[in-house]
């Protein structure tokens, strides 16, 4: 706003927790989604700055807005400035290596962002004519993912797993691999999760080289956090802030972007809180009536265009393990693949602990992947499934009671299970073994050799934590 006379100023008329009613002059009502700012002193004389977003027009020149900051200390009668536009956040290379809040303000104590460009967080999804409709697989360099539950370029993947099974390390490896193999960048949205987890992720990213402290612009990721101690408005909008940064890398820099949301359930949960505060009638299980619309508006912006792609990996919390709960059920409708992490595999020391039988992908079709890849994946799954069925018999009677054919299946399945493990680049500092990126062709070649029985004479330990099959052969030779 250039001069004071053109400013549109209203006054707070009612405060209900994080929801504010604001009265404006006749004919000066701000638009829905406009950002409003309140700069004032509270009763203790301390400076306050609160940003809120218009959600409803109440009539009589009154609007109802949801605050993005805590509203403690606000009073009726305080002046509210209409910025005349939606929330704008910084975008571009200068966001890499930094941590932002929902308003696009850096919160990592590294000073302001030197930035030329900013974009509004509310944007329309790309038009259909701009979309890239080709079905192509997004190679991650992680054997178990690429072979058995491949990601779609520009697709959406659900990441399921409890605490301590390796979600964070898998996320960091994906960030590292997209930067090295695809020249892409990543944006991480921490939506309504613990502050401690956000801090741990940031620290681990610095240790593993995903964030380069000496020269932040060489970092591979931008972080946007709206933690669970923040108002529901911030948690509801933080995913859009991060998505806006990701869209810039896709549309302007024409890059492949990995977009992480941890956790998509908290996005829905925040929307439910805001919906109730705005006085909307709740729908099933107390969720907002606009649940599918809100989820659709976010998910439709995550897509591939002819310029670049946003491939999204979303951690999904399932309340009370009920997959029919409206929040996870609505999320599933948008997912192209699921990566399920297994505590059983993690306890065996097989990392990444991706469950090869529970993880799924819509890309696992012969007409998309080709017969060679599809046939190999199906044979691996068949072998592992048979091993799973035989485990009870082995536990009771032992291996010797199995038929010759079944013993061969078990031996190959154990080799496959170990060959699905892989040393990660980001874990080098902890494990001491160098990370490996395995191309899809090498992955298929390796598993086909195991399935064909070419490597039946090798010890199964030779397949544990190696990259391609040649490394397994080298390891076996060194073990003799």
Curated annotation (Swiss-Prot):
Cross-referenced InterPro entries: AAA+_ATPase, ATP-synt_VA_C, ATP_synth_F1_bsu, ATPase_a/bsu_AS, ATPase_alpha/beta_chains, ATPase_F1/V1/A1_a/bsu_N, ATPase_F1/V1/A1_a/bsu_N_sf, ATPase_F1/V1/A1_a/bsu_nucl-bd
Q: What is the reaction catalyzed? A: ATP + H2O + 4 H(+)(in) = ADP + phosphate + 5 H(+)(out)
Protein residues bound to ATP: 161-168
Kindly list the biological process annotations in GO that this record carries: proton motive force-driven mitochondrial ATP synthesis
CDD domains found in the cross-reference section: ATP-synt_F1_beta_C, ATP-synt_F1_beta_N, F1-ATPase_beta_CD
**Where would you say this protein principally sits, based on its record?**
plastid
**Per UniProt, what is the membrane topology?**
Peripheral membrane protein
UniProt keywords, alphabetically: ATP synthesis, ATP-binding, CF(1), Chloroplast, Hydrogen ion transport, Ion transport, Membrane, Nucleotide-binding, Plastid, Thylakoid, Translocase, Transport
Q: Where in the cell is it found?
A: Plastid, Chloroplast thylakoid membrane
Recorded GO molecular functions are: ATP binding; ATP hydrolysis activity; proton-transporting ATP synthase activity, rotational mechanism
Indicate the enzyme's highest-level EC class. translocase
Q: Supply the PANTHER family for this chain.
A: ATP SYNTHASE, ATP SYNTHASE SUBUNIT BETA, MITOCHONDRIAL
- Protein name per the record: ATP synthase subunit beta, chloroplastic
Species of provenance: Tetradesmus obliquus
């Amino acid at each position: 706003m250039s001069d004071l006379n053109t400013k549109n100023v209203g006054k707070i008329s009612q405060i209900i927790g994080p929801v504010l009613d604001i009265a404006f002059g006749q004919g000066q009502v701000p638009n829905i989604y406009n950002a409003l700012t309140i700069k004032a002193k509270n009763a203790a004389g301390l400076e306050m700055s609160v940003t809120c977003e218009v959600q409803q027009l109440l009539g009589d020149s009154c609007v109802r807005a949801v605050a993005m900051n805590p509203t403690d200390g606000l009073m009726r009668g305080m002046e509210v400035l209409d910025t005349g536009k939606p929330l704008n956040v910084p975008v571009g290379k200068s966001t890499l290596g930094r941590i932002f809040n929902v308003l696009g303000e850096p919160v990592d104590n590294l000073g302001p962002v030197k930035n030329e460009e900013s974009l509004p967080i509310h944007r329309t999804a790309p038009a259909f004519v701009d979309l890239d409709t080709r079905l192509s697989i997004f190679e991650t360099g992680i054997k178990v993912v690429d072979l058995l539950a491949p990601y779609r370029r520009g697709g959406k993947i659900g990441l399921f797993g409890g605490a301590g099974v390796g979600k964070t390390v898998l996320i960091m490896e994906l960030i590292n691999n997209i930067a090295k193999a695809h020249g892409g960048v990543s944006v991480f949205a921490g939506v309504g999760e613990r502050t401690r987890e956000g801090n741990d992720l940031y620290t681990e990213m610095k240790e593993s080289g995903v964030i380069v402290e000496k020269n932040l612009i060489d970092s591979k990721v931008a972080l946007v956090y709206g933690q669970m101690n923040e108002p529901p408005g911030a948690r509801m909008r933080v995913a859009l802030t991060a998505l806006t940064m990701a869209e810039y890398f896709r549309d302007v820099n024409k890059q492949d972007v990995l977009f992480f949301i941890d956790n998509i359930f908290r996005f829905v949960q925040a929307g439910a809180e805001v919906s109730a505060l705005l006085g909307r009638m709740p729908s099933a299980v107390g969720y907002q009536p606009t649940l599918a619309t809100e989820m659709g508006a976010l998910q439709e912006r995550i897509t591939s265009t002819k310029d670049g792609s946003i491939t999204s990996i979303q951690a999904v919390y399932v309340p009370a393990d009920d997959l029919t709960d409206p929040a996870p059920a609505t999320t599933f409708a948008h997912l192209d693949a699921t990566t399920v992490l297994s505590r059983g595999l993690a306890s065996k020391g097989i990392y990444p602990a991706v469950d090869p039988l529970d993880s799924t992908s819509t890309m696992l079709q012969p007409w998309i992947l080709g017969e060679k890849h599809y046939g190999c994946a199906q044979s691996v799954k068949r072998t592992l499934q048979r091993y799973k069925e035989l485990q009870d018999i082995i536990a009771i009677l032992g291996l010797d009671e199995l038929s010759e054919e079944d013993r061969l299946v078990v031996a190959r399945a154990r080799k496959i299970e170990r060959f699905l493990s892989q040393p990660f680049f980001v874990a080098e500092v902890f494990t001491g073994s160098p990370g490996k990126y395995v191309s899809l062709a090498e992955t298929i070649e390796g598993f086909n050799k195991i399935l064909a029985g070419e490597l039946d004479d090798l010890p199964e330990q030779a397949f544990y934590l190696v990259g391609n099959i040649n490394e397994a052969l080298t390891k076996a030779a060194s073990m003799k």
